[in-house]
């Protein structure tokens, strides 16, 4: 959730650190800071509340010099957003930045106070700085002091330590919070996200759980949780250097909405032919594993959970395999029964979602036949720890509110469902061809849906002064309504809820009045007549209706019901298609309200803590 950047180089690194933080702004933060040391052990620490630009201005004014440094954007967990709670934190000559939550920080704080340490902040991170300073008094090196320190920490952390008396190195430790190391020529770097470093390197190594690494200009030495020197794979990144550029678009979210046709084409490339799904392209041993699956368990959070809920209908309707979907933060804390030959599927854009990662680790202990992930970030923890990974190819997603990651997850899930049904002989060649042809048609159809932008922008004015909104859908369009509701509340701060339309009479109907917009996702399908009855229930009570439907659905609008007529598309991919107008609606409502579309308040892009 926070952002970390570090560098050890011959050149001054302050500009590299600040630029790295700029590239991580999308993750969400409330304050930022840097600590830089030069070859004469002169340390400069600057922290600012607010945007990275305020930190950048202060760094420029101070003319910060030095070839070794660490930087951080903070998203408050312990202690209010303030300059004194901003990172880096210091203890004597030690400076520390940290992502995560130290669960035993209160116990450690009491211990350190008994040793005479005085705390200036309310954060859990400051205990790390004091512990390292204490251990360094007897340790042979900063590396040893950090190794001794992390053994005392409980919880999740990615932490980086700098000693002003040893400006040739920094030490980083990872447990539950991602850290990537970037390799340069005569200089090395680290960050919580490779995007921060794409302007200085393309060669990356991901630390694994329990790793501690010592980074100098010429070497990166990695040690595992037992203190043994280990080698980790170094890989070349193909991520775009200019991924952090909005180009012609006003916001990253708008850009990413428009990138969806290309993202879908990239995700499908090599995975489907003209008339079939290429099972082998889904993952190593996918064909063998899928042939044995009797049950699917999907675990995810947020938008990814909504994708899983949509896919549940597909697994059971198309592949004939039972499927459960659960929120990761609930799944990991309850006792559950593992069904025979169950496949666990985790969904995550970042591959670092803390609850989803913990759920994966728990499930692997509980006898699941196999664990796969559908993920957008190669080399992420979920990808490394799963038995096989089906990578979406959405490209870097900057906006906190997910768009192209969601639709590419849905496309990946539909391909997986088809492969599963195919391997088990549950779908015919004709059905497989129908699904694949619908997928091939989808990018062009989404391009057409984007042409409704101006109409939806005009529609958004009806919502901007409202305090509540309901979204309704049936079948696989209920989770699409859930996703639409999530988008609206995330970026416009309007309270929004989604309901299966059949639940209206069980409570939500009491909310209907002339100030309550009700958005209905209503393509023509076998549930349409049922849905029309629900629409009439809202009309009869004076509700404001906004119905997204194709011409075949046969809705007729009036002063209380606006019809947004969409082109007819295949029922197979309609759930993906109808996501697009919902995204545009949320975007334009937020734009009219003047909220921060790309970095909505209190939210972060990658939720790497509980």
Swiss-Prot record:
Alphabetical list of CDD domains matching this protein: GFAT, SIS_GlmS_GlmD_1, SIS_GlmS_GlmD_2
Function text: Catalyzes the first step in hexosamine metabolism, converting fructose-6P into glucosamine-6P using glutamine as a nitrogen source.
Transmembrane segments: none
SUPFAM superfamilies: N-terminal nucleophile aminohydrolases (Ntn hydrolases), SIS domain
Catalytic residues (UniProt): 2 (nucleophile), 605 (for fru-6p isomerization activity)
Domain Glutamine amidotransferase type-2 residue range list: 2-218
Compartment list: Cytoplasm
GO biological process: carbohydrate metabolic process; fructose 6-phosphate metabolic process; protein N-linked glycosylation; UDP-N-acetylglucosamine metabolic process
EC number: 2.6.1.16
SIS domain mapped to chain residues: 286-426, 459-600
Name of the protein in question: Glutamine--fructose-6-phosphate aminotransferase [isomerizing]
């Amino acid at each position: 959730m926070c952002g970390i950047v570090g560098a050890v180089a011959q050149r001054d690194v302050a500009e590299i650190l600040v630029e790295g933080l700029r590239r991580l702004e999308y993750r969400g933060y409330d304050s930022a800071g840097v600590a830089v040391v030069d070859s004469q052990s002169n340390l400069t620490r600057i922290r600012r509340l607010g945007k990275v630009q305020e930190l950048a201005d202060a760094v420029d004014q101070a003319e910060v010099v030095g070839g070794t440094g660490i930087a951080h954007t903070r998203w408050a967990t312990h202690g209010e957003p303030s300059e004194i709670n901003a990172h880096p934190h210091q203890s004597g000559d030690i400076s520390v930045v940290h992502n995560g939550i130290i669960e035993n920080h209160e116990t450690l704080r009491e211990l350190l106070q008994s040793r005479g340490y005085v705390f200036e902040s309310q954060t859990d991170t400051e205990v790390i700085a004091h512990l390292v300073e204490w251990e360094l008094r007897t340790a042979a090196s900063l590396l040893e002091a950090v190794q001794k320190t992390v053994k005392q920490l409980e919880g999740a952390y990615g932490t980086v330590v700098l000693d002003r008396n040893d400006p040739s190195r920094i030490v980083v430790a990872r447990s539950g919070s991602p850290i990537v190391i970037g390799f340069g020529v005569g200089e090395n770097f680290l960050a919580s996200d490779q995007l921060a470093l794409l302007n200085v390197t393309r060669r990356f190594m991901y630390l694994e759980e329990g790793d501690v690494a010592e980074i100098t200009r010429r070497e990166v030495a990695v040690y595992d949780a037992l203190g043994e020197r280990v080698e980790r794979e170094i890989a070349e990144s193909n991520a775009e250097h200019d991924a952090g550029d909005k180009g012609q678009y006003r916001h990253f979210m708008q850009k990413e909405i428009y990138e969806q046709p290309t993202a879908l084409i990239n995700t499908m490339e090599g995975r489907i032919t003209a008339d079939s799904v290429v099972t082998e392209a889904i993952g190593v041993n996918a064909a063998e594993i899928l042939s044995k699956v009797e049950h699917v368990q999907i675990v995810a959070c947020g938008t990814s959970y909504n994708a899983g809920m949509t896919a549940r209908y597909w697994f059971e309707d198309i592949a004939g395999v039972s499927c459960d979907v659960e929120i990761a933060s609930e799944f990991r804390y309850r006792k559950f029964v593992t069904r025979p030959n169950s496949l666990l599927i985790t969904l995550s854009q970042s591959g670092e979602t803390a609850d989803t990662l913990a759920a994966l680790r728990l499930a692997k202990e509980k006898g699941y036949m196999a664990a796969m992930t559908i993920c957008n970030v190669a080399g992420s923890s979920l990808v490394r720890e799963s038995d096989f990974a089906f990578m979406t190819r959405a490209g870097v997603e900057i906006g906190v509110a997910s768009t192209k990651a969601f639709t590419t997850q849905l496309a990946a899930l539909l391909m997986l469902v088809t492969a599963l049904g195919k391997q088990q002989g549950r779908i015919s060649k004709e059905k497989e061809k129908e699904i694949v042809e619908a997928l091939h048609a989808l990018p062009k159809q989404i391009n057409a849906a984007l042409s409704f932008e101006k109409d939806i922008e005009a529609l958004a004015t009806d919502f901007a002064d409202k305090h509540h909104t309901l979204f309704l859908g049936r079948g696989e369009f209920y989770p699409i309504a859930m996703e639409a509701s999530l988008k609206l509340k995330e970026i416009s701060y309007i309270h929004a809820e989604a309901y299966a339309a059949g639940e209206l009479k069980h409570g939500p109907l009491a909310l209907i009045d002339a100030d309550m917009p009700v958005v209905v996702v209503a393509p023509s399908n076998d549930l349409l007549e049922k849905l029309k009855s629900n629409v009439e229930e809202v009309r009869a009570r004076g509700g404001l209706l906004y119905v997204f439907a194709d011409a075949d659905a046969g809705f007729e609008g009036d002063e209380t019901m606006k019809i947004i007529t969409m082109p007819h598309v295949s029922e197979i991919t309609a759930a993906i298609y109808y996501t697009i107008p919902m995204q545009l609606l949320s975007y334009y409502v937020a734009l009219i309200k003047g909220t921060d579309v790309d970095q909505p308040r209190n939210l972060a892009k990658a939720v790497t803590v509980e």
